[in-house]
Design a protein with these regions (language model features):
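Low-complexity, glycine/proline-biased repetitive segments and flexible coils/loops
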Residues: 2-300
């Protein structure tokens, strides 16, 4: 267990600190193995695994957070005219653009959602990512990407939706992002074309086309905990034979012709890339989604 006692006056690093944000005498302890950080007049923790945040000695004021769910797994395929879709990014909830919150003295559970497994068969979609949460504040896991089989071709709904898969002249639709919005919809697959990209926090997954697979939706970059992190990107859609590859950013998994999709990056909530078609009946798997993240900070 780690302890941090907050005990400051009204001025930190030359910046005047409003009295309502002074956390004098409040003690914060943690379990698990979060990484502590300090930035400006803020301190906090980055959780890449489960733990607890324990507040004692008074109300912790001015709390900000970014919570990212696990990314969805990519879809699979097993033919040269088929393509699995990209997984959707894990949902993102944050209050850095809005009002801060207060945490009363008690123990707050922190759970970091696992990324969803990429599909290893054309009869199953990629799995949805798991939810991340700080107490009752929940970021929904990303939707799995659709695979080639007709029953599982549509992308799954989630924090951001998974993309739609393709089987020859039949294509699936993109999954829908959760409401209230924590991300964007997945892109649709293209008939006689490539699969759709998974949705990202900032933009929707791109639809596949007859020349190119769908790009994963964009996430965003933040230095909330002093480390520059690119998070919340959707996975790229798998490639129909002869098409060019879509791209993925911000932790989403990419794709390569006639190959398994790439995994989303750990602790970004990135969606997994879709499997790309190959002749001979060989299955090309979807990439796994990236695990989520919980970051929390407060003024001294």
């Amino acid at each position: 267990m780690r302890r941090d006692r907050v005990n400051s006056g009204g001025s930190v690093g030359g910046w005047f600190e409003p009295p309502q944000y002074v956390n004098r005498g409040v003690e914060v302890t943690v379990t698990g193995s979060p990484t502590p950080f300090a930035t400006g007049n803020y301190v906090g923790y980055t959780f890449t695994g489960n733990g607890d945040l324990i507040v004692s000695g008074g109300t912790l004021r001015g709390v900000e957070y970014i919570i990212v769910g696990g990314g969805g797994g990519g879809g699979a395929c097993n033919g040269s005219t088929d393509a699995g879709a990209g997984g959707g990014a894990g949902g993102v909830v944050r209050n850095t653009d809005y009002s801060t919150i207060e945490l009363q003295p008690k123990t707050y559970s922190v759970v970091v959602g696992a990324g969803g497994a990429g599909s290893t068969t054309n009869t199953l979609k990629g799995s949805n990512g798991s939810n991340s949460f700080l107490s009752s504040i929940i970021a929904i896991g990303g939707g799995g990407g659709g695979s080639e089989n007709s029953a599982v071709r549509d992308g799954a709904d989630g924090g951001s939706g998974g993309g739609g898969g393709v089987n020859g002249n039949s294509a699936g639709s993109g999954g829908i992002a959760t409401t209230p919005a924590q991300g964007n919809n997945g892109g649709a697959g293209a008939s006689a074309g490539s699969a759709g990209g998974g949705g990202g926090f900032t933009s929707a997954g791109q639809n596949g086309s007859t020349t190119k697979s769908g790009d994963g939706g964009a996430g965003f970059t933040t230095t909330f905990d002093t480390t520059s992190r690119s998070i919340g990107g959707g996975g790229a859609g798998g490639i129909y034979s002869g098409d060019s590859a879509g791209t993925a950013t911000d932790g989403g998994g990419g794709v390569t012709a006639a190959a398994d999709g790439s995994n989303g990056t750990a602790n970004t909530g990135g969606g997994g890339g879709g499997g790309s078609g190959i002749s001979g009946g060989f299955t090309r798997n979807g990439g796994n989604g990236g695990s989520g993240l919980v970051m929390v900070r407060w003024p001294l």
